[in-house]
Amino acid sequence: MAGEEDWIELKFRLADGTDIGPSKYNQSMTVSSLKEKLISQWPKDKENTPKTVNDMKLINAGKILENNRTLAESRLPVCELPGMIITMHIVLRLPTLDKKSEKLQNDPPMKNRCVCTIL
């Protein structure tokens, strides 16, 4: 079938070792739209959940996939066998700096500061 070649079977491994998939995806799909689909399929029992596509990185064969490229452009056919399920890793980069900066802004400034004087 010619239409079968347009599809790729992917499985996604999370940091804790659990998987999403395997499922078939069209190779013309962009990495960004794939990430949106993954956010909607994200396991509800997980503590960390990505909110946007920028909260996660997809890694295939050691390469970080770019959001604006298609799955066909992002594939590394050297590592693949026909009919094989490709495992990609998901790395979350959730915004933690906002919490730290809010904490620093909400903390009162230190009033007792040590001052050294050399005579």
UniProtKB/Swiss-Prot annotation:
A Pfam family reported for this protein in Swiss-Prot or TrEMBL: Rad60-SLD_2
Principal place of residence: membrane
Matches recorded under Gene3D superfamilies: Phosphatidylinositol 3-kinase Catalytic Subunit, Chain A, domain 1
Subcellular location: Cell membrane
Source taxon at top rank: Eukaryota
Lipidation (S-geranylgeranyl cysteine): C116
Matches recorded under InterPro entries: MUB, Ubiquitin-like_dom, Ubiquitin-like_domsf, UBL3-like, UBL3-like_ubiquitin_dom
Keyword flag Lipoprotein: yes
Lipidation (S-palmitoyl cysteine): C114
Modification Cysteine methyl ester, positions: C116
Keyword Disulfide bond included in the entry's annotation: no
Topology in the lipid bilayer: Lipid-anchor
Tissue distribution of the protein: Ubiquitous.
Role played: May serve as docking site to facilitate the association of other proteins to the plasma membrane.
Miscellaneous comment text of the record: Heat stable and remains soluble at temperatures exceeding 90 degrees Celsius.
Protein name per its UniProtKB record: Membrane-anchored ubiquitin-fold protein 6
Gene this chain is encoded by: MUB6
